[in-house]
């Protein structure tokens, strides 16, 4: 059996985190649901760029959408778990000397107590 066998889903998940724009989208979606238009205004990017990143994030299982009229609202998928992953990444980045706020809720106590910023 190949050493990489079965790692495809994990690689797809981490691919979702591998781009600064996708991280910015995730960070903004952590504040609640948003339409593509709202994300483009917040990020200052073209609609096609944001839509492409949302498609990637949806393919990775990190975001979900629901139709509202002619638009779609995007939100984090598996929200509590995704907040935990982002908070853990913040702690790891802090330990390595590269503190970054990835999740607006990182100061919110999780199952293991308060998250470190």
Question: What is the predicted role of each segment?
Answer:
Residues 1-9, 27, 79-117:
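Amphipathic alpha-helical dimerization/coiled-coil segments
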Residues 8-49, 70-81:
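N-terminal helix-turn-helix DNA-binding core of bacterial DNA-binding proteins
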Residues 38, 66-67, 102:
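A generic structural-conservation signal
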Residues 41, 52, 58-59:
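Alpha-helical residues within the helix-turn-helix
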Residues 58-69, 75:
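Beta-hairpin "wing" of winged helix-turn-helix
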């Amino acid at each position: 059996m190949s050493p990489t066998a079965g790692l495809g889903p994990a690689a797809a998940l981490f691919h979702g985190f591998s781009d600064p724009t996708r991280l910015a989208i995730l960070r903004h979606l952590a504040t609640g649901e948003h339409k593509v238009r709202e994300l483009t205004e917040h990020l200052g990017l073209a609609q096609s760029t944001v839509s492409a990143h949302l498609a990637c994030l949806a393919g990775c299982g990190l975001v979900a959408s629901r139709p509202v009229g002619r638009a779609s609202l995007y939100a984090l998928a598996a929200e509590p778990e995704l907040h935990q992953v982002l908070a853990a990444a913040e702690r790891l980045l802090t330990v390595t000397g590269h503190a970054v706020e990835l999740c607006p809720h990182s100061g919110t106590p999780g199952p293991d107590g308060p998250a470190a910023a």
